[in-house]
């Protein structure tokens, strides 16, 4: 059964975001190559498939299934904070102090309980450090002369040069991948 969520989305040049998404899935099913992955389940993919969305007029939301919007927004806010503590994500998501969230899980809990713990990071009921994951890389990128706050730099640069092609944020810090609970 397919659950449909109705969203008001305007048409872009190539159709709605959902139409582009479904066309991408069809293309991947027909032309994709099966690959192994770290989970042992495997994936099917194609190289370089692109979709483009004009965010001034539309939002690329999947509408053929329930969208975990609260989880998406919570995780994004957590990344923007630069936090590496999975329990902070739980606070944002559930809106309660971490002491009241013992046993509550987020999308990152399993990573904190397995990979991060194996890497030697703090893992208690109220603190679950993940190492220098996405938000840390966005807000505290290790650089030769200190740290770079990529989000602050992009926001500042967009103000002064909105047409620049250099507004880039990356979480792929090759020097830190081996100490991340879940590398990008």
Locate the predicted segments by residue.
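Methionine residue identity
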Residues: 1-4
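Terminal, non-catalytic protein-protein interaction segments that mediate quaternary/complex assembly
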Residues: 15-184
């Amino acid at each position: 059964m397919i659950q449909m969520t109705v969203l008001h989305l305007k048409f872009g040049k190539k159709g709605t975001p959902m139409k582009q998404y479904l066309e991408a899935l069809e293309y991947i099913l027909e032309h994709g190559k099966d690959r192994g992955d770290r989970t042992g389940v495997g994936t099917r993919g194609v190289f370089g498939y692109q979709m483009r969305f004009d965010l001034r007029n539309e939002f690329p939301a999947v509408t053929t299934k329930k969208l975990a919007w609260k989880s998406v927004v919570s995780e994004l806010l957590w990344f923007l904070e630069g936090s590496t503590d999975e329990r902070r994500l739980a606070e944002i998501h559930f809106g309660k102090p971490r002491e009241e969230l013992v046993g509550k899980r987020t999308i990152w809990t399993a990573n904190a309980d397995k990979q991060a713990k194996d890497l030697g990071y703090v893992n208690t009921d109220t603190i679950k450090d993940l190492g220098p994951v996405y938000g840390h890389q966005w807000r505290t990128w290790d650089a030769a002369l200190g740290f770079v706050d990529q989000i602050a730099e992009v926001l500042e640069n967009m103000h002064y040069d909105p047409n620049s092609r250099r507004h880039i944020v990356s979480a792929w810090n090759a020097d830190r991948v081996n100490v991340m609970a879940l590398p990008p």
